[in-house]
């Protein structure tokens, strides 16, 4: 089963919620302002922010042909095109090698699991991978990552619990440089985005990578639980201010009925979703495909 098929299965809840409401809207045969107001309400109820929903509706108004609002197929295709455009406007090129990927985020979003899945993904692309256990505060975090590293068959760099996470990163990138490793993936401790001291620690890790491995393509990716909904955008805004994020990794995409916040990440913060988890298995994480995502929810 390809990622496209997995995506369709994972997004069934979102599709049922979003496209179901659209069908009801078309059945009412509303036109003009009434139609646009209800379309905006549908977008907002699917966790698209107010400002992004207003932007989508404005684009529909600008592009729609007079007399076509009652044509369900026409409006659906127009909406599809607009939503794809919003996501593609923030897209970035795939990383160049060598690259360092540092995963950040709050507790419980699945960062450590995502490190293992990303390691498997890059290994399947023929790349050499090292993972760094820089979550030195959570009990048994490095042991959990060791299990994932063993399953993915990649090298792990770790220190004792309570060690300085920046020291782990220093050792990992130094070793990767010496060995010619293609990809280093860094696991970090979960942190509340309101704790400034923890954010300062992230900035220190950022500086270590930039100083010790300047030739590497360095991506700082925020891991977001897709079931968080609109609050995910607030998390992204604060983490972006702290470390200038390069993109998003979504987990639990199969567990949400409201995926609309993804459009707000792109529209308001210019943050692309780079990878998405669509299941529990090691291989259930792939590059995010904007067009496939929109097709799956419409």
Predicted feature descriptions by range:
Residues 13, 17-134, 141-186:
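Primarily NTPase-proximal linker/entry elements flanking Walker-type ATP/GTP-binding cores
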Residues 62-65, 191, 244:
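Glycine-rich phosphate/diphosphate-binding loops and the adjacent beta-loop-alpha structural elements
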Residues 165-179, 194-298:
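Conserved catalytic-core segment of NTP-binding enzymes
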Residues 4, 53, 72, 111-115, ...:
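Alpha-helix N-cap/helix-start motif
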Residues 1-18:
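N-terminal accessory targeting/assembly segments
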């Amino acid at each position: 089963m390809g990622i496209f098929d997995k995506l369709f299965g994972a997004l069934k809840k979102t599709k049922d919620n979003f496209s179901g409401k659209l069908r009801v809207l078309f059945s009412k045969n509303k036109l003009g302002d009434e139609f646009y107001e209800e379309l905006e309400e549908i977008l907002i109820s699917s966790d698209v922010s107010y400002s992004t929903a207003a932007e989508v509706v404005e684009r529909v108004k600008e592009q729609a042909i007079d007399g076509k609002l009652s044509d369900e197929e026409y409006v659906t295709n127009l909406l599809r095109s607009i939503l794809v455009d919003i996501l593609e406007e923030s897209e970035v090129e795939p990383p160049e090698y060598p690259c360092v990927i540092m995963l950040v985020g709050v507790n419980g979003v699945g960062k450590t699991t995502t490190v293992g899945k990303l390691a498997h993904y890059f290994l399947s692309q023929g790349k050499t991978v090292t993972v760094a256990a820089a979550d030195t505060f959570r009990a048994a975090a490095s042991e959990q990552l060791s299990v994932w590293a063993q399953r993915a068959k990649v090298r792990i760099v770790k220190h004792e619990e309570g060690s300085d996470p920046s020291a782990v990163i220093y050792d990992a990138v130094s070793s990767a440089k010496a060995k010619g490793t293609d990809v280093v993936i860094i696991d970090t401790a979960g942190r509340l985005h309101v704790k400034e001291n923890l954010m300062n620690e992230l900035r220190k890790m950022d500086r270590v990578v930039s100083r010790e491995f300047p030739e590497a393509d360095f991506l700082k990716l925020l891991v977001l639980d897709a079931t968080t909904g609109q609050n995910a955008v607030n998390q992204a805004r604060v983490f972006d201010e702290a470390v200038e994020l390069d993109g998003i990794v979504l987990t639990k995409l199969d567990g949400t009925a409201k995926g609309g916040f993804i459009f707000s990440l792109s529209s308001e913060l210019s943050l692309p979703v780079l990878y998405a988890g669509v299941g529990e298995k090691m291989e259930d994480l792939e590059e995010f495909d904007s067009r496939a995502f929109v097709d799956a929810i419409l």
